[in-house]
């Protein structure tokens, strides 16, 4: 529907971001806050978000302050801050126009348990938010957001997070303090104790709020959900120093960060620069469970979550004390090791135009280590690459395959035919898919018990041993026979001897 705001506007403009009322078309309502309603809309042929302010009867001083805020907001540019595109500052018609962030706010995503959000992804989202807030805090003058909460973190189509809603933001010079005079501004559940107690505060109040958000991102629960009365809540947080309970299985690095952020002493809280650095470690811990794998990634790519294959393999060879790729003979085991690891780990970059053919993603690296780990201590003579090569050399190993594709490859094969693949539901586990009596396909899990493998309640030292010892056969099933392994020609081709003088390393 049309905004209905009329077409008259003053000739004097407040600056480049001023938008005429007739340029804005309102569509459906997508959110409501204390200062206004947010609509999906269109402006100058672009899909946008339009915030219609509840309060429109501005006096001259308030209108001047609003226009000043609009002017300041127009100068904030950062990938993790919702892009301010303009505003109408005409009295009675005040709206703010921003980019439209399609997946809504983080609060809604977190509390919808049907949506899968792995811890690694959630911690990456937390880092995005920290990057945006850090940009505000490092500005001059300093922006103190004052209302950091999960509903003010928007999520785009790539699951990247952007800070929004600067309605309560305060500007201050560095090293200066702020103080509320009449009422504490912000959302009580996320509000720092010093703000609730009308004490002086600074940007560290945003750090406290972020600590509560970080707990919410971790647990996917509402903070302080048992509190109902504001006064009792204020006493619990400000006097008794109550904080939400951190789960026992929380990563140690994440626990330490949360506790630092919501410290009762503002001066003890970290800056957002320090928070970002801590989250770099947390993200690696969340993506990689193998301790040596974590050590490798932190020493090699601490701030990166995706790296070019060449940079990755050079770093891994150096860390594991294996021969460098440019020193390997094409017929050597070391060269074959590199080819095999690339076959299961490297993938095309998600972003176009990078100029890089293949990359390694930290999350996939962590999963591969769960399948082939643990990673041995760095030493000449054996590395994780040897383990990968040994498994890929078995004709029956098919790697990353879902149930449907596994059944397709076994269709029409003799009874007893089988293949082994990664489990599609349990990281670190494998699945044996086999043709049984009647020609149907049966899928059975091989679980990990430390470095050993459990198949049908029998413990084996390796996948290869399960096959070589003719594992299985319980409950009338067919025992495994290596002769009936269905070949995976993709992996088998890696083991062809290279003779061409002109062949270059791939």
UniProtKB/Swiss-Prot annotation:
Start and end residues of each stretch annotated as Disordered: 1-21
Residue intervals of the SH2 domain: 396-488
Cellular localization per UniProt: Membrane
Domain Protein kinase residues, every copy: 24-284
A Pfam family assignment: PK_Tyr_Ser-Thr
SUPFAM superfamilies: Protein kinase-like (PK-like), SH2 domain
Active-site annotation: 147 (proton acceptor)
Substrates-to-products reaction catalysed: L-seryl-[protein] + ATP = O-phospho-L-seryl-[protein] + ADP + H(+); L-threonyl-[protein] + ATP = O-phospho-L-threonyl-[protein] + ADP + H(+)
Protein keywords: ATP-binding, Kinase, Membrane, Nucleotide-binding, Serine/threonine-protein kinase, Transferase, Tyrosine-protein kinase
Location (main, coarse): membrane
GO cellular component, one term: cytoplasm
Binding-site list for ATP: 30-38, 51
EC number: 2.7.11.1
GO biological process, one term: signal transduction
A GO molecular-function annotation: ATP binding
Basic and acidic residues bias spans: 10-21
Sequence similarity: Belongs to the protein kinase superfamily. TKL Ser/Thr protein kinase family. SH2 domain-containing protein kinase subfamily.
Biological function: Required for proper chemotaxis and phagocytosis; proper spatiotemporal control of F-actin levels in chemotaxing cells. Negative regulator of the PI3K (phosphatidylinositol 3 kinase) pathway. Predominantly phosphorylates serines and threonines and tyrosines at a lower level.
Protein name: Dual specificity protein kinase shkC
Native organism: Dictyostelium discoideum
Lineage: Eukaryota, Amoebozoa, Evosea, Eumycetozoa, Dictyostelia
Name of encoding gene: shkC
